[in-house]
């Protein structure tokens, strides 16, 4: 990739520079049209610009034109948009003077017009002057076949023009605010408009007779809360017709580019990477083959197999942050990020048809040129195959063919007349027969042939003989009503309820319809009706009657799936909160409980004995899973926890004074409302990283950060959220691995050498190796250390607290705890415990050393 910033490629007059608002490339890749604040449209020569990419000293070449080919100044205000027609014949320009001009290149040399530059090489004349808008015109777009043109502006109007006569076809005022962008579907079925009312409206148009338009869908979800400070909302449609890139979208508090899928019109993907609102997105007009990362050198018929059949599309996005990002549909991260590529906001972008050059305009009056090497984005598929990807949406090749001259249209009419002359005029006579004869309809011929084949008389040899034959016997199919099965009577089963009344027991309807048997009966009756002239209808056998009667009279239904012969093995586990008798007597408020339905296996004495021995637990309605997650984390067994204070901003440091890294955590909401999705959507957690006093990254998280720690050995930040998730990021903000969900609140994070130790609220320990990014220890319980004394009663008291944790050289976990004896005024004692990875249990450090020494002695002996 090369970046060109030429001093003469800008809108400049004398000593003053003007903002450039728009640019567009002609279909033949020979001209670049730009417009800006000076109210002039400038046409540049692209081949002359590209000579500077190959030769930096090309300014000394006299053959290179370092000025515009033409400069047009017919607008009375700033030029906000210019667009070449797809056939390259016209150039449309819109301005804040509310006038839409249609330009056409004039062949030959003519006298310069008033107001035009006398040194212009090309001369563009205004063919039509369209007046219909009541305010600034913001964007213009042509249909792929140049049949219609759509213009939008600040007057909320969407005006559709005829592409050949430039008459106004229709006007829509469906938006509630300024309309700042419009784009056409490459399959020529839709066009989309973007407005400051935070919506995108999809219009469907049909070219059946008079063109009709209708609003297909309204997209609002990606643009909730989007800022209204952007001057443009320039959309772009992918060349395969599958996606729309819409700038100035929002993902929480972050400005993004929304990728909208065709058909569903949903936005499952957002391009996140811009600090300020985006104003323009532009798809590369070429489709590229997807290159595998692990491409092999194997060949099949002399061709490499490293390239798959899947394709990629390239999209560029930019806006007020002066940053250009180039994305690929197959990668989650941008291919290219060029920061501060311009001095001010970027207003427009345009690709050449071959997809190798990108032009960028900015408010700093510069026009930036980016040139890409061959196969830098991948191997581009031929342009003819682009149409094949659009065929699934109904596009045809005829809609993409443009008549170049009047002679071409005359030749096409002559070709149509030639085809009509070659049509066989005797086709109707051949079908109906010669005059004077009556031909039998084709359907009767087929029936007569079939009847002849069944009777064995052979085929007819002449059409005249069929008229003398007997009229064919046609079977008439009559609709038969569903008859009840003979021998089966509807039996109602009466039951007696508790109060002595009789009720009809319900019959399961699963066997009321047997798909297999009903289908067989329908097929059998149809076959019998078709062959009623050959053989009489047979009655069902007595065995079938008895089977049907049994199936309909049964009260049991077949299961929807097969069950094993011995049943399904189940295991029920849980807490016994109350005895059955107490639950029936106390828990039920219904006085009409049927005691006969309660199966009590134990006797009264056994129940009294159980209730006296065990402590009955009562379920507290406030102790729910939601309340556990919402409450503040419990740190009763930690002497020092690492939970962040519930403040606006919290700082964490790692490293030395000479090499200091700082992490700033700004939780968007308080922990009391951490599960309020709407509040988190509006105020996400913001994490800032600093190194040597300079900001190195900025990240947004959809959760509240509970604790964090840094590891200087691996230069990694570890963040834990209130939802039990861990994030591992480096000092540049890149994720070292996908987020890890533990399912428990992490109340302490500490590092030891290149390991990170996580202690959860449920007294479990996890250890990760940050060098290999692997899990070293998992689900190590602390309860054997915290509750070493036998528990008496129904309550457990923890008298020990964890003071510190670290990893040894043998990758064993060592804990230092303080123990306070109950009802004692003595100083707390310090205890040391070691979790041996080889023994998978807790032990004292001395015992572990003895075990290691004995093992070494056995090995040496």
UniProtKB/Swiss-Prot annotation:
A GO CC annotation given for this chain: HIR complex
InterPro entries: CAF1B_HIR1_beta-prop, HIR1-like, HIRA-like_C, HIRA_B_motif, WD40/YVTN_repeat-like_dom_sf, WD40_repeat_CS, WD40_repeat_dom_sf, WD40_rpt
One of the GO biological process terms: DNA-templated transcription
Location in or out of the cell: Nucleus
Positions of WD repeats: 14-54, 74-113, 132-171, 174-213, 227-270, 295-337, 341-382
Keywords tagged on the record: Chromatin regulator, Nucleus, Repeat, Repressor, Transcription, Transcription regulation, WD repeat
PROSITE patterns named in the record: WD_REPEATS_1, WD_REPEATS_2, WD_REPEATS_REGION
Pfam families hit by this protein: Beta-prop_CAF1B_HIR1 (PF24105), Hira (PF07569), HIRA_B (PF09453)
Composition bias, Low complexity: 455-466
Main location: nucleus
Keyword match Repeat: yes
Region called Disordered, residue ranges: 450-471
GO molecular function: nucleosome binding
Superkingdom, taxonomy of origin: Eukaryota
PANTHER family named in the record: MEMBER OF THE HIR1 FAMILY OF WD-REPEAT PROTEINS, PROTEIN HIRA
Family statement drawn from the similarity comment of this UniProt entry: Belongs to the WD repeat HIR1 family.
Protein's job: Required for replication-independent chromatin assembly and for the periodic repression of histone gene transcription during the cell cycle.
Protein name as catalogued: Protein HIR1
Originating organism: Kluyveromyces lactis (strain ATCC 8585 / CBS 2359 / DSM 70799 / NBRC 1267 / NRRL Y-1140 / WM37)
């Amino acid at each position: 990739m090369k970046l060109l910033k030429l001093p003469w490629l800008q809108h400049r007059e004398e000593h003053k520079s003007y903002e450039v608002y728009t640019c567009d490339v002609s279909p033949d890749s020979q001209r670049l049209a730009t417009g800006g604040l000076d109210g002039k449209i400038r046409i540049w020569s692209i081949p002359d610009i590209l000579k500077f990419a190959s030769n930096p000293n090309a300014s000394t070449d006299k053959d290179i034109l370092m000025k515009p080919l033409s400069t047009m100044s017919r607008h009375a205000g700033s030029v906000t948009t210019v667009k070449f027609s797809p056939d390259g014949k016209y150039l449309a320009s819109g301005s804040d003077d509310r006038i839409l001009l249609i330009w056409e290149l004039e062949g030959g040399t003519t006298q310069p017009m008033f107001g035009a530059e006398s040194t212009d090489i090309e001369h563009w004349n205004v063919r039509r002057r369209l007046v219909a808008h009541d305010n600034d015109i913001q964007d213009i777009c042509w249909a792929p076949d140049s049949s219609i043109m759509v213009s939008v502006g600040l007057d909320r109007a969407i005006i559709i023009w005829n592409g050949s006569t430039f008459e106004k076809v229709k006007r829509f005022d469906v938006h509630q605010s300024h309309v700042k962008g419009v784009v056409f579907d490459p399959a020529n079925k839709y066009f989309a408009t973007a407005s400051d009312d935070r919506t995108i409206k999809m219009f469907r148009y049909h070219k059946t007779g008079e063109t009709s338009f209708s609003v297909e869908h309204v997209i609002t979800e990606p643009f909730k809360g989007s800022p209204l400070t952007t001057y443009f909302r320039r959309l772009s449609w992918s060349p395969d017709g599958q996606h729309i890139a819409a700038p100035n979208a929002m993902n929480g508090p972050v400005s993004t580019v929304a990728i909208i899928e065709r058909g569903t019109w949903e936005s499952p993907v957002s391009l996140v990477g811009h600090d300020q609102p985006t104003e323009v997105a532009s798809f590369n007009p070429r489709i590229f083959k997807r290159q595998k990362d692990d491409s092999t050198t194997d060949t099949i018929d002399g061709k490499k197999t490293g390239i798959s059949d899947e394709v990629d599309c390239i999209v560029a996005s930019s806006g007020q942050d002066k940053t250009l990002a180039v994305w690929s549909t197959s990668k989650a991260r941008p291919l290219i990020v060029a920061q501060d590529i311009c001095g001010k906001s970027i207003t427009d972008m345009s690709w050449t048809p071959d997809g190798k050059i990108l032009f960028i305009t900015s408010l700093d009056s510069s026009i930036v040129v980016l040139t890409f090497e061959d196969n830098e984005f991948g191997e581009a598929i031929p342009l003819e195959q682009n149409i094949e990807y659009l065929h699934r949406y109904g596009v045809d090749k005829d809609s993409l063919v443009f008549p170049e001259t009047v002679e071409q249209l005359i030749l096409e009419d002559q070709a149509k007349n030639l085809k009509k002359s070659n049509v066989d005029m005797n086709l109707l006579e051949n079908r109906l027969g010669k005059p004077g004869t009556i031909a039998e309809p084709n359907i009767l011929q087929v029936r007569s042939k079939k009847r002849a084949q069944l009777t064995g008389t052979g085929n007819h040899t002449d059409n005249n003989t069929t008229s003398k034959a007997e009229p064919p016997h046609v079977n008439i199919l009559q609709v038969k009503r569903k008859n009840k099965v003979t021998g089966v009577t509807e039996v109602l089963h009466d039951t007696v309820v508790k109060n002595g009344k009789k009720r009809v027991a319900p019959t399961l309807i699963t066997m009321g319809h047997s798909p297999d048997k009903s289908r067989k009966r329908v097929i059998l009756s149809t076959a019998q009706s078709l062959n009623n002239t050959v053989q009489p209808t047979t009655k069902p056998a007595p065995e079938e009657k008895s089977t049907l009667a049994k199936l309909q009279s049964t009260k049991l239904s077949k299961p929807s799936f097969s069950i094993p012969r011995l049943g399904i093995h189940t295991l029920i586990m849980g807490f016994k909160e109350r005895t059955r008798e107490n639950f029936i007597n106390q828990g039920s408020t219904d006085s009409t409980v049927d005691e006969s339905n309660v199966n009590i296996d134990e006797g009264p004495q056994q129940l009294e004995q159980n209730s006296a021995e065990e402590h009955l637990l009562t379920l507290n309605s406030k102790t729910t899973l939601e309340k556990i997650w919402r409450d503040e984390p419990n740190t009763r067994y930690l002497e020092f926890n690492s939970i962040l204070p519930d403040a606006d901003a919290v700082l964490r440091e790692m490293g030395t004074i000479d090499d200091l890294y700082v992490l700033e955590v700004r939780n968007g909401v308080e922990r009391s409302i951490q599960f309020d999705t709407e509040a988190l959507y509006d105020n996400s957690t913001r994490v800032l990283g600093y190194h040597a006093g300079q900001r190195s990254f900025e990240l947004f998280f959809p959760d509240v950060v509970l604790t964090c720690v840094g590891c200087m050995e691996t230069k990694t930040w570890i963040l834990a959220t209130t939802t039990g998730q861990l994030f591992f990021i480096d000092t540049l903000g890149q994720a070292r691995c996908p987020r890890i969900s533990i399912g428990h609140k992490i109340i302490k994070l500490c590092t030891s050498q290149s390991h990170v130790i996580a202690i959860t609220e449920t007294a479990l320990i996890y250890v990760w190796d940050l060098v290999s990014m692997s899990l070293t220890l998992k689900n190590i319980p602390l309860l054997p250390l915290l509750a070493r004394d036998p528990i008496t009663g129904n309550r457990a008291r923890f008298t020990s607290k964890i003071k510190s944790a670290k990893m040894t050289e043998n990758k064993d976990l060592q804990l230092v705890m303080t123990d306070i004896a109950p009802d004692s005024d003595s100083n707390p004692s310090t205890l040391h415990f070691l979790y041996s990875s080889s023994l998978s249990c807790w032990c004292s450090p001395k015992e572990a050393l003895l075990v290691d020494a004995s093992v070494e002695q056995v090995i040496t002996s």
